[in-house]
Amino acid sequence: MTKVLLVEDNEMNRDMLSRRLIRRGFQVVFAMDGQQGIDLARSERPDVILMDMSLPVIDGWEASRRLKADDATRSVPVIGLTAHAMSGDREKAIEAGCDDYDTKPVELDRLITKIERLIGTAKDEALRQAV
């Protein structure tokens, strides 16, 4: 079962997205701010992280940078999520270390396609490094 770390401070968004992911067969772990997301990424070892970019304590931009700078979490794919579909946000998310980017409200099939692609890429990379 694919483990998703959902880092989202908005209870309604967190509830709605997690229920939809669970119905599609994902295991979901929650964090409500960027620091908690970093801590849970280290302890829970998720397959993918869905990172809201507007978070308290440490925002998603900085949390993504820290995750990608940490040997323990750098290989975990991060998908940045934001309600702001501004020009340049995707590029900003990639520069912050996100592997992909999506807008809210989330279109679930599109998001799952991104998750599956990134998990496949991460597993391929892990196999190459193991050889």
Describe the role of every protein-language-model region:
Residues 8, 32:
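Conserved acidic carboxylate
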Residues 15-23:
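Charged docking surfaces used in two-component/phosphorelay signaling
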Residues 44-50, 55:
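Active-site beta3 strand of CheY-like receiver
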Residues 56, 74, 86:
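The feature encodes the CheY-like receiver
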Residues 106-115:
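C-terminal output helix
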